[in-house]
Amino acid sequence: MVRLVLLIVATFVGNAVAADELPRRKSGLWSMSVTMPGASVPLTMQQCVDERTDDITGTMADRNKACRNQTKRTDDRLAFDAICKVGKTTSTTRGVFVGDFKSGYTVESTTTFDPPMAGMRNGVTKAAAQWSGPCKSDMKPGDVVMSNGTKFNINDHKSAKKK
């Protein structure tokens, strides 16, 4: 389930912006909240990042190379548009990242799928992230802890275990 949620987030946002186009986040513990179509409550998680594991757009998803991307950076904003082929579906995403990536950022994106993907025709994804301080002593860079206690490392996405 965790991987499915992260795959959906990455599909909405991850293919739209290449990781090298985003500013790097400050190393440490980031608290995130994501609202997705069909979810009754936001998905919350904490992630320990450093310069090697910082991938806002989702290491968990295989990047689809069949995307046409456009980005425009102004001050603390990064607007993006992308048209991607995901299997037989074309996804069209438009959104914006806002923030300094040192203390926090938000992202909002609107995606349409043609034909619908997993029964979904379109949706708006919103996320907010705040730097919380140094990583906890029991976390290493790449560790993600979901609100239900599931813990995994983005570098070892084959294992998801209960904390």
Task: Annotate each language-model stretch with its function.
Residues 6-18:
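Hydrophobic h-region of N-terminal signal peptides that target proteins for export
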Residues 58-102:
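Mid-chain, structured segments of secreted extracytoplasmic proteins
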Residues 119-161:
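Edge beta-strand at a domain terminus
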